[in-house]
Amino acid sequence: GVDEEVKQDTGGVYGNANQSDANILAVLDMRNQELTLVSISRDAMCTLDVLDSTGAHVGTATAQLALAYSYGDGAERSCELTSAAVSRLFYDLPIPAYGSIYMQGIRQLVDSVGGVTVTPDASFSGFTAGQPVTLTGQRTENYIRYRADSTEGNNQRMQRQKQVVLALVNKMLAQVKE
């Protein structure tokens, strides 16, 4: 997920894009037909490809994963750069496909399936621990973006992001089967 409502116009200049917010690696076990989601902190330090303002590769740098997306064009090239950084982080794990979605898009996607139901692990900002809630619209974004002022705030946020993605995938699969 991209840390912005909608794609910004970079004016064709590389290095002007938003940062990634949620970085989730989907691992498909085709033999056992299982999906595992691995959340990767946007603050994870990794080797990033650095591009100049025209998009030419000028080297690498060690920096936060969130910055990989920002070095690109805010679209496919940003996804390629983030995918390459995640691959390196996992010892050159092949990543055959990738995608990104802006915050407005995740709200629209969740709304398109009639919302998703999740159970918060902790109480915060209008959500109660252990009380299932069906997320739609702005509440979806509030749920996945809230960051507590604690050392575990980022980890809790990543868990909620993963929880929403898994609930969304399960709901879409259930609707396809109907």
What function would you assign to each model-found segment?
Residues 1-178:
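Non-catalytic, solvent-exposed segments at the cell envelope interface
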